[in-house]
């Protein structure tokens, strides 16, 4: 089974290869839920898995990908997806952003995916009955927010949690996505600002290509990195200006409430919690206590390094 284009994720790839080997012999694949932070490559991994599922003739089965934010109703799910693509067909359906599945569709999926020894179910809607034969139909789901998916639906799926990318993995992703010659010392600095994110690594490769094209160069060395990061405003550890601003605000007091932080940054509480605090906590630059937020010793050292 081939996942050659996927860097890292060795345990996940072994597990998926096991499922593929079984599907090639029995035509049955478990319905899978891919879970990972944004930019980790979960959709690519799901699509790569789907591209290797076979139909009854031993040929690659067709895949359709649905962005669940566009699923408006159960009626559209049945009329626009199930009737034209599932009824009498062999298909794999990938639900991307699965946390956005509408409640009516979610409840229908509970019936459709109810496990049984026959590995098939019927679903009736407006006098139309659709057969879901799981030797012909496989459902895949991808999400960053598994906690928002109804637990009964999650229980019907095999959950695939992606591993965190190492810095070496990220460096390989950068090199894979550019023909430029990047020196080892420059790559060491590049890896430090990618925030553990595969998508950031791909974007970085594109930016390096643009930089070298503008300079009419083929090689990216340490001197280029210094110029490159200054032009793009890349901060140490890949922190954003807002994350640095938060550290500076936290450094002013021993404790800062989320409400006060929201007022000073003019960001909503939800946005602060979802978009900025996680990475700062991951790097141990800030802590969240019962009474508020505070900067750590490492956070203060980071601010000192900027002076």
Where are these regions (language model features)?
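Short glycine-rich substrate-engagement loop in P-loop NTPases that contacts/grips substrate
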Residues: 13-14, 60-88
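Conserved AAA+ ATPase "SRH/arginine-finger" region at the nucleotide-binding site
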Residues: 144, 158-170
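Conserved AAA+/SF3 P-loop NTPase catalytic/coupling segment centered on the Walker-B
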Residues: 74-78, 87-117, 146-155
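Dynamic helix-loop-helix/coil hinge segments at AAA+ ATPase domain boundaries and subdomain interfaces
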Residues: 1-15, 235-237
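C-terminal helical "lid" of AAA+/P-loop NTPase domains
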Residues: 188-192, 199-214, 248, 278
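Terminal-proximal interaction/regulatory segments of ATP-powered molecular machines
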Residues: 254-307
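Conserved catalytic/switch belt of AAA+ P-loop NTPases
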Residues: 21, 103-133
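Walker A/P-loop
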Residues: 21-25, 29-66, 82-85
């Amino acid at each position: 089974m081939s996942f050659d284009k996927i860097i890292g994720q060795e345990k996940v790839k072994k597990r998926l290869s096991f499922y593929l080997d079984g599907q090639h012999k029995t035509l049955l694949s478990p319905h899978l839920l891919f879970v990972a932070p944004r930019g980790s490559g979960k959709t690519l991994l799901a699509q790569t898995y789907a591209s290797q599922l076979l139909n009854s003739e031993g040929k690659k089965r067709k895949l359709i990908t649905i962005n669940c934010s566009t699923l408006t109703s159960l009626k559209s799910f049945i009329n626009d997806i199930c009737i034209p693509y599932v009824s009498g067909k062999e298909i794999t359906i990938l639900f991307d952003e699965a946390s956005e599945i509408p409640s009516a569709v979610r409840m229908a999926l509970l019936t459709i995916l109810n496990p049984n020894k026959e590995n098939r179910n019927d679903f009736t809607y407006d006098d139309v009955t659709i057969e879901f034969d799981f030797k012909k139909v496989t459902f895949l789901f991808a999400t960053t927010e598994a906690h928002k998916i109804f637990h009964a639906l999650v229980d019907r799926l095999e959950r695939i949690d992606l591993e965190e990318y190492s810095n070496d993995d990220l460096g390989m992703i950068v090199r894979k996505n550019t023909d430029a010659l990047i020196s080892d010392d420059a790559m060491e600095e590049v890896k430090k600002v990618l925030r553990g994110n595969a998508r950031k690594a791909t974007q970085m490769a594109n930016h390096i290509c643009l930089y070298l094209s503008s300079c009419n160069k083929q090689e990216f060395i340490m001197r280029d990195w210094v110029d490159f990061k200054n032009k793009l405003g890349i901060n140490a550890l890949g922190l954003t200006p807002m994350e640095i601003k938060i550290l500076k605000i936290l450094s002013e007091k021993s404790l800062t409430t989320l409400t006060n932080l929201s007022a000073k940054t003019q960001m909503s509480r939800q946005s602060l919690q979802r978009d900025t605090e996680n990475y700062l906590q991951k790097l141990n630059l800030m802590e969240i206590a019962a009474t508020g937020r505070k900067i750590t010793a490492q956070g203060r050292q980071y601010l000192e390094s900027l002076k």
